[in-house]
Amino acid sequence: MTKKPVPDASIAETAVIEAPAGTGATVSRRSFLKFAGASGLASATGALAAGAARADVTHTTPPDGSPEQIHLTWGDDPTSEVVVSWASLAASANPRVLVGADHGRRDTVHAVQRTYTDGLTGVVVFTYHARLSGLKPATTYTYEVTADNDSHAGSPFSSSFTTAPRGRAPFRFTSYGDLATPNTGWVLSSPQSRFAVDAVERFQPLFHLLNGDLCYANLNPAHQTDVWRDFANNNQTSSTRRPWMPCPGNHEIEFYNGPQGLDSYLTRYTLPDNGSRFSGRWYSFQVSSVLFISLDADDVVYQDAAAFVAGPMPLVPAASTGHAPIAPGSSFYVRGYSNGEQTRWLEQTLRRAADDRDIDWIVVQMHQDALSSSKTGNGSDKGIREAWLPLFDQYGVDLVVCGHDHDYERSYPVRGCNRHAGIDAKTGEAVDTLQPRPVPHTHANPDATTFDTSHGTIHLILGGGGTSAPLDVYGVDMGNGNPQAQVFTKPNRPVAGTTAGTFVRPTADALEDAIWSAQRDTGTGYGIAVFDVDPGEHGGKTTMTMNYYHAPGADQTPNPDYELFETVTLEKRRR
């Protein structure tokens, strides 16, 4: 998408279904899932008009500089730096954070203001970022967030956080993706997202990994900023107490919001520096002996699943934006936007980690999936397999955590691939999907729960945050009964729909036996992974134990009670 004109429909690909705004028409959940599951997205069509159907968004007091949507992220060094970020409904005067160790002296850190104007609605969003530096490792700090025009200045927002330990030390982190908001007036939101945030607090991690598709604002084009607001305010009960480290997903890509559609995401989050011109899109940080690498998979995937106009009406931005209507069939496809810069950065980061004796583990976070056998969701993407899996093999990545498909799936450790093992989904002809190959003998015992990841990488699909569209139905090869995956091996360009003037995006073009799939949760799509890292002793083993908790029955009725589904231990020789 260029800076000025309508997105080029010839290079756009995304699929979506939504009734034109203001018509009073609705799309059933069943129909929505059919389209969202088939193409990995949902759609946006119609004009952005005052009075369009929407969720309740009421402001009972005049907008001022009162802090809200408060969240923490790690700085470049989690042992000594935390960033406090927030938003306000109007510009804040002298926005600041007061911080100090428990019962100690308080320092004032002034925040930097960042704004963006939503490209569809013209709403100006004010955000603030205070970088707290010079902190001590493994230390608890209390802080207050306020401004001169904070209506709660007499009793400002306050919370606390704990910095990461220095050197090898045990710690806990949690992860899931695809969270949404509790406001059921928004497309794909569900009350389960409230319970998902509570689940993080139940397990008290040092930090949380949020694996993309944060709130699905691009599925609510007339109210994108309101959706973001509901999302961030919902998270405050956890994200103000511990860093929430995100990666962008396809639903963070929004029309007219920057070259990759990520202006909202990038304005709201301050993330570790990657030293490139694409700040905030990918990054890394180290806690204890674990290197965490966060990637933007939209740069390499074949599937187009970002902002999309299904038609038959164009998407018409608010007049104040000065932006042209977006034609039916347009989608925001960004594959290759970094021209290989992200992949080169990834290789350099992995190479340095391989030479660093203080790093035992490498965990990669991204949104889309290299290994997924979801039938009603998106499936796997050959683009990731081509660009990044060889690097994961070469440099010994231990674990990959993703979202995208709204379910839980765990792979065996994989290393290398089988060539020409897939088939065309329509013709049955052979297709090279680069089928990931399980490490020999790891799948001989399907009940095994301990794996040496020095021999291969385990992939986890953790897409059951809080979205209203669980996708816990998995593919089966009807010929042999084995798990089966659908795979995108080429772009899924929009094609004409069955209704005149509408467009859809095709599902994945290839199929393969999912010989790499070790565990799938057919009971519910919702859950949270809890990881406990034990650095071990010199000369011995180090372990990372994953307990996956799911919410039985939440597909039908939101459920706050998460129960243990499985426990898996990753182990390897400590450096």
Region spans (language model):
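N-terminal active-site segment of His-dependent metallophosphoesterases
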Residues: G65-Q69, D76-E81, S88-A93, A101-R106, ...
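Ligand-binding face of N-terminal immunoglobulin V-set domains in extracellular IgSF glycoproteins
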Residues: F126-G134
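N-terminal secretory signal peptides
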Residues: M1-V27, T45, R54
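Mature extracellular/periplasmic domains of secretome proteins
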Residues: A196-Q204, A232-T237, Q348-R352, A387-L391
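Metal-dependent phosphoesterase/phosphodiesterase active-site architecture
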Residues: E18, D56-R96, G104-R106, Q113-T115, ...
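N-terminal twin-arginine translocation
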Residues: A25-K34, L41-T60
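Active-site glycine-centered loops adjacent to acidic/histidine catalytic or metal-binding residues
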Residues: D178, G212-D213, G249-N250, H367, ...
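The substrate-binding groove and active-site-proximal loops of carbohydrate-active enzymes
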Residues: L179-L188, L214-T225, N250-H251, D298, ...
